């Protein structure tokens, strides 16, 4: 907890003004205030009207917001109030509002909240304004705002004190409004296709559903250690067993791993599961989600991102992982080979072989991550991941070395992960046990055995297609943002 700092001169003056308001019988931290308009509604309705037309109409309005600018001398003043939608100018005359109201205006500081009732008008300069008739003091700001005209420029302060960033940086404010709209549209898209939105536990006895290191905590009442979820997958698939058929969850997951421009320890995912579907159906669903967001939120398929044009319209490219490696690195993993042969290839291509690697599949994945990922700029579905790195995915019928799984890559980064779900409980148990062995050999991201989930599968789960999308990265793409911290209202800070 931050310590209370010593008051500077500005803060002392603001507290004096707070006491002056109280002495005048005015509550410096007011109560409910009813508006007739926000700033956007006023601009949309009246920006096209002339000064004379507005005078003829003699319309009145009631607005409220934070005082962002104030100027004027003597008996006339101008100011701008800022609400969620933007700003509206105030025109305040002492002979219109009276002595008491004009004193409120004169003594108001930037950052204070005011409610204003008055006539909707235009000034001689043509700016839409409210000519004040009555002012109501709503809240005293005891600290000054950051830089008046240039916004908040210190990056760390923007992240630690996001409220100041939102007040002073309209671009940042709009980015988070866009984030909310994106999430709403994803919900609308899924709901419209018959999916049920559900909620599953954040605290779990066993962290599963992804290859990641979890955060641990202790449940005092039950006296057991628990893990914060690293994915929502296993509980959602239990609901498929239970007959819910089409489910999704939008929520936070937690991974105790590194932080960089595209990773934060807590982040938002959307996972969905659909009975009787396979991974190719889920490719279509994924395309649909991205294209729906493009159409409804940003209004275009071609996005400017990281100095590149990304086209999310039409069919996304689809390529098998082995073919992608062959094309980029010139190494062919289609012919069957021993682990020793694959290890030799890895050393030839400067790929480190971890001690928990036990199969060719691990080597294939390392080749892909080192040589291929960064080349995938336009939306690309990479499918056919090795079985060893896909413990929850169904094996491919034609080549059981690989799975019916895909990842969506854009600009060299993963945006989605999906597969035809493994629904054979015997195979699932064997893969869990292989993961547990890898964990013993030092693989921090390997999971343990979730016997309860295996038991659920033993009751029968229909063929199912599942999807996971990283919402934060999706928002980054659609807002042209290259740092994940700029799309998280309160990113993790030391």
Swiss-Prot record:
SUPFAM superfamilies: Class II aaRS and biotin synthetases, Nucleic acid-binding proteins. GO terms for biological process: lysyl-tRNA aminoacylation. Signal peptide: none annotated. Its cofactor is Mg(2+). Mg(2+) 1 binds at residues 407, 414. Keywords: Aminoacyl-tRNA synthetase, ATP-binding, Cytoplasm, Ligase, Magnesium, Metal-binding, Nucleotide-binding, Protein biosynthesis. Binds 3 Mg(2+) ions per subunit. GO terms for molecular function: ATP binding; catalytic activity, acting on a protein; lysine-tRNA ligase activity; magnesium ion binding; transferase activity; tRNA binding. It is an enzyme of class 6 (ligase). CDD domains: LysRS_core (cd00775), LysRS_N (cd04322). It is found in: Cytoplasm. Mg(2+) 2 binds at residue 414. Its EC number is 6.1.1.6. One of its GO terms (cellular component) is cytosol. Transmembrane segments: none annotated. Disulfide bonds: none annotated. InterPro entries: Aa-tRNA-synt_II, aa-tRNA-synth_II, aa-tRNA-synth_II/BPL/LPL, Lys-tRNA-ligase_II, Lys-tRNA-ligase_II_N, Lys-tRNA-synth_II_C, NA-bd_OB-fold, NA-bd_OB_tRNA. It catalyses: tRNA(Lys) + L-lysine + ATP = L-lysyl-tRNA(Lys) + AMP + diphosphate. Homodimer. Belongs to the class-II aminoacyl-tRNA synthetase family. This is Lysine--tRNA ligase. It comes from Lactococcus lactis subsp. lactis (strain IL1403).
């Amino acid at each position: 907890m931050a310590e209370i700092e010593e008051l500077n001169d500005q803060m002392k003056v603001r507290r004096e003004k707070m006491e002056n308001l109280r002495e005048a019988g005015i509550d410096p931290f007011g109560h409910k205030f009813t508006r007739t308009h926000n700033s956007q509604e006023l601009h949309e309705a009246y920006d096209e009207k002339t000064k004379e037309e507005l005078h003829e109409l003699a319309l009145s309005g009631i607005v409220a917001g934070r005082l962002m600018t104030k100027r004027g001398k003597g008996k006339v003043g101008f100011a701008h109030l800022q609400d969620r939608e933007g700003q509206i100018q105030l025109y305040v005359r002492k002979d219109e509002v009276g002595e008491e109201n004009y004193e409120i205006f004169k003594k108001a500081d930037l950052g204070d909240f005011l409610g204003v009732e008055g006539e909707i008008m235009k000034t001689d300069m043509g700016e839409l304004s409210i000519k004040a008739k009555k002012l109501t003091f709503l809240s005293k700001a005891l600290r000054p705002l950051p830089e008046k005209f240039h916004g908040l420029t210190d990056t760390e302060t923007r992240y630690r004190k996001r409220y100041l960033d939102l007040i002073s940086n309209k671009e940042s404010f709009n980015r988070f409004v866009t984030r909310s709209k994106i999430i709403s549209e994803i919900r609308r898209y899924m709901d419209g296709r018959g999916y049920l939105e559900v909620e599953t536990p954040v605290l779990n006895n066993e962290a599963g559903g992804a290859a990641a290191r979890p955060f641990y905590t202790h449940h005092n009442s039950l006296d057991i250690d628990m893990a914060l979820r690293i994915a929502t997958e296993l509980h959602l698939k239990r609901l498929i067993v239970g007959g819910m058929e089409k489910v999704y969850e939008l929520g936070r997951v937690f991974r105790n791993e590194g932080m960089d421009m595209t990773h934060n320890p807590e982040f938002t995912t959307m996972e969905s599961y659909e009975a009787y579907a396979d991974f190719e159906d889920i490719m279509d669903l994924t395309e649909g989600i991205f294209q729906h967001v493009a159409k409804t939120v940003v209004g275009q398929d071609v996005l400017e991102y990281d100095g590149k044009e990304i086209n999310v319209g039409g069919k996304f490219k689809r390529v098998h992982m082995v073919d992608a490696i062959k094309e980029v690195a010139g190494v062919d993993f289609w012919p069957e080979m021993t682990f020793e042969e694959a290890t030799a290839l890895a050393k030839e291509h400067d790929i480190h072989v971890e001690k928990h690697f036990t199969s060719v599949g691990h080597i294939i994945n390392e080749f892909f991550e080192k040589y291929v990922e960064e080349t995938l700029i336009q939306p690309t579905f990479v499918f056919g991941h090795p079985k060893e790195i896909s413990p929850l995915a169904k094996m491919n019928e034609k080549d059981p070395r690989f799975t019916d799984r895909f990842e969506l890559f854009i600009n060299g980064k993963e945006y989605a992960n999906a597969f035809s779900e493994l629904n054979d409980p015997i195979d699932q148990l064997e893969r869990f046990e292989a993961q547990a062995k890898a964990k013993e050999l030092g693989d921090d991201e390997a999971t343990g055995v979730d016997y309860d989930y295996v038991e659920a599968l033993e009751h029968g789960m229909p063929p199912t297609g599942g999807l996971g999308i990283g919402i934060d990265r999706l928002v980054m793409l659609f807002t042209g943002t290259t740092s994940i911290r700029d799309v998280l209202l309160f990113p993790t800070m030391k």
